[in-house]
Amino acid sequence: MFARSAATILAFVLVTLTAATPAYYAPGTKTTSVDKAVPAGQCNVGNQQCCNTVQEASSNPVAGLLGLLGVNVQDVTGLVGLTCNPITGIGGLNSNCDASPVCCENNSFGSLISIGCIPISL
């Protein structure tokens, strides 16, 4: 009799704790899927960037950076690249990018952030 009561109480406690525990989402782990990459030849050479991170403008770290720069998140189209470097080479050919090669519209924030990016294939 006691074993049955203890098992019932234990099951109730476990269910209660599981239901009351908030879900954990690790910051910065949001991934973005892209259906089709633009060929590098269709992007202006000066706009080709190799970014360490590419995320949606609404993601937590990117939205915070955009806010500090005075950029409205709702006005951003495309992805946002962080810590980007220009891809050198004629038309992006024979260039090497081990991170995320993207074509960005607005690179006016130096190498910290590039706005309006779309993935490209080199």
UniProtKB/Swiss-Prot annotation:
Gene Ontology terms: cellular component: extracellular region; fungal-type cell wall
InterPro entries linked: Hydrophobin
Disulfide bonds: 43-103, 50-97, 51-84, 104-117
Translocase found in the keyword field: no
Pfam families assigned: Hydrophobin
Induction details: A CT-rich motif, which is often found immediately upstream of the transcription start point of highly expressed filamentous fungal genes, is present at the expected position. One additional CT-rich region is also found upstream of the TATA box in the promoter region.
Top-level taxon of origin: Eukaryota
Subcellular localization(s) per the UniProt record: Secreted; Secreted, Cell wall
Signal peptide: 1-20
Known glycosylation sites: 106
Molecular function per GO: structural constituent of cell wall
Keywords annotated in UniProt: Cell wall, Disulfide bond, Glycoprotein, Secreted, Signal
Presence of keyword Nuclease: no
Family, per entry: Belongs to the fungal hydrophobin family.
Assembly: Self-assembles to form functional amyloid fibrils called rodlets. Self-assembly into fibrillar rodlets occurs spontaneously at hydrophobic:hydrophilic interfaces and the rodlets further associate laterally to form amphipathic monolayers.
Primary role: Aerial growth, conidiation, and dispersal of filamentous fungi in the environment rely upon a capability of their secreting small amphipathic proteins called hydrophobins (HPBs) with low sequence identity. Class I can self-assemble into an outermost layer of rodlet bundles on aerial cell surfaces, conferring cellular hydrophobicity that supports fungal growth, development and dispersal; whereas Class II form highly ordered films at water-air interfaces through intermolecular interactions but contribute nothing to the rodlet structure.
Protein name (Swiss-Prot/TrEMBL): Class I hydrophobin 4
Source organism (scientific name): Flammulina velutipes
Encoding gene per record: Hyd-4
